[in-house]
Amino acid sequence: MPLWSIAEGIPTLDVIKAHQFVEQKGAMLIGPNCPGLISPGKSMVGILPGQVFLEGNVGVISRSGTLTYEIVYHLTANGMGQSTAIGIGGDPVVGLHFRQLLEMFQNDPETEAIV
Protein backbone atom coordinates (compact mmCIF):
# COMPACT_ATOMS: atom_id res chain seq x y z
CA MET A 1 0.00 0.00 0.00
CA PRO A 2 1.51 3.37 -0.95
CA LEU A 3 1.53 6.22 1.56
CA TRP A 4 1.82 9.73 0.21
CA SER A 5 3.22 12.91 1.80
CA ILE A 6 2.63 16.33 0.24
CA ALA A 7 4.33 18.26 3.04
CA GLU A 8 7.68 19.84 2.23
CA GLY A 9 10.51 20.83 4.51
CA ILE A 10 10.19 17.76 6.74
CA PRO A 11 13.48 17.32 8.64
CA THR A 12 15.70 14.77 6.89
CA LEU A 13 16.05 12.47 9.90
CA ASP A 14 12.27 12.40 10.33
CA VAL A 15 11.84 11.32 6.70
CA ILE A 16 14.47 8.59 7.14
CA LYS A 17 12.67 7.29 10.25
CA ALA A 18 9.30 7.41 8.49
CA HIS A 19 10.72 5.57 5.49
CA GLN A 20 12.17 2.83 7.71
CA PHE A 21 8.86 2.47 9.56
CA VAL A 22 6.86 2.28 6.34
CA GLU A 23 9.23 -0.35 4.88
CA GLN A 24 8.91 -2.47 8.05
CA LYS A 25 5.14 -2.45 7.56
CA GLY A 26 5.47 -3.58 3.93
CA ALA A 27 4.17 -0.30 2.52
CA MET A 28 5.70 2.32 0.21
CA LEU A 29 6.27 6.03 0.82
CA ILE A 30 5.79 8.55 -1.97
CA GLY A 31 7.20 11.98 -1.16
CA PRO A 32 7.53 14.14 0.80
CA ASN A 33 7.10 17.38 -1.17
CA CYS A 34 5.28 15.71 -4.04
CA PRO A 35 2.07 16.33 -5.98
CA GLY A 36 0.90 12.72 -5.64
CA LEU A 37 0.01 10.12 -8.23
CA ILE A 38 -2.72 9.49 -10.76
CA SER A 39 -3.88 6.62 -12.93
CA PRO A 40 -6.21 8.53 -15.28
CA GLY A 41 -9.73 7.18 -15.37
CA LYS A 42 -9.07 5.07 -12.27
CA SER A 43 -7.80 6.96 -9.23
CA MET A 44 -5.87 9.96 -7.99
CA VAL A 45 -4.22 10.91 -4.71
CA GLY A 46 -2.82 14.39 -4.31
CA ILE A 47 -3.03 17.80 -5.89
CA LEU A 48 -2.53 16.90 -9.54
CA PRO A 49 -4.69 18.85 -12.03
CA GLY A 50 -6.69 15.83 -13.24
CA GLN A 51 -8.11 17.62 -16.29
CA VAL A 52 -4.75 17.52 -18.14
CA PHE A 53 -4.42 13.74 -17.89
CA LEU A 54 -5.62 11.21 -20.45
CA GLU A 55 -5.95 7.47 -19.91
CA GLY A 56 -3.31 5.60 -21.89
CA ASN A 57 -0.08 3.60 -21.74
CA VAL A 58 2.76 6.05 -20.92
CA GLY A 59 4.16 6.03 -17.38
CA VAL A 60 5.45 9.35 -16.04
CA ILE A 61 7.90 9.85 -13.15
CA SER A 62 9.24 13.22 -11.99
CA ARG A 63 10.69 14.98 -8.95
CA SER A 64 9.00 18.22 -10.01
CA GLY A 65 5.24 18.73 -9.88
CA THR A 66 5.35 21.52 -12.45
CA LEU A 67 7.50 19.45 -14.82
CA THR A 68 5.07 16.55 -14.40
CA TYR A 69 2.16 18.77 -15.46
CA GLU A 70 4.13 20.15 -18.42
CA ILE A 71 5.13 16.68 -19.67
CA VAL A 72 1.60 15.36 -19.28
CA TYR A 73 0.11 18.40 -21.01
CA HIS A 74 2.26 17.76 -24.09
CA LEU A 75 1.66 14.00 -24.05
CA THR A 76 -2.10 14.55 -23.83
CA ALA A 77 -2.06 17.26 -26.52
CA ASN A 78 -0.42 14.72 -28.83
CA GLY A 79 -2.89 11.95 -28.03
CA MET A 80 -0.55 9.98 -25.78
CA GLY A 81 -2.37 9.04 -22.59
CA GLN A 82 -0.80 8.03 -19.32
CA SER A 83 -1.05 4.74 -17.43
CA THR A 84 0.16 6.36 -14.20
CA ALA A 85 1.97 9.58 -13.37
CA ILE A 86 3.93 9.86 -10.13
CA GLY A 87 5.61 12.86 -8.55
CA ILE A 88 8.24 11.41 -6.23
CA GLY A 89 9.04 14.66 -4.44
CA GLY A 90 11.77 17.22 -4.55
CA ASP A 91 13.18 16.99 -1.03
CA PRO A 92 16.70 15.57 -0.52
CA VAL A 93 15.33 12.30 0.92
CA VAL A 94 12.23 10.72 -0.61
CA GLY A 95 10.48 7.38 -0.26
CA LEU A 96 10.33 5.71 -3.66
CA HIS A 97 13.11 6.47 -6.14
CA PHE A 98 13.26 6.48 -9.94
CA ARG A 99 14.89 3.03 -10.06
CA GLN A 100 12.14 1.40 -8.00
CA LEU A 101 9.39 3.04 -10.02
CA LEU A 102 11.05 2.15 -13.33
CA GLU A 103 10.99 -1.51 -12.26
CA MET A 104 7.31 -1.22 -11.32
CA PHE A 105 6.46 0.37 -14.67
CA GLN A 106 8.46 -2.31 -16.54
CA ASN A 107 6.30 -4.95 -14.83
CA ASP A 108 3.03 -3.06 -15.43
CA PRO A 109 1.10 -4.56 -18.37
CA GLU A 110 -0.71 -1.21 -18.84
CA THR A 111 2.55 0.71 -19.42
CA GLU A 112 4.33 0.55 -22.79
CA ALA A 113 6.62 3.59 -22.47
CA ILE A 114 8.09 5.66 -19.62
CA VAL A 115 8.97 9.36 -19.43
What is each model feature region?
Residues 1-115:
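Catalytic-core regions of core metabolic enzymes
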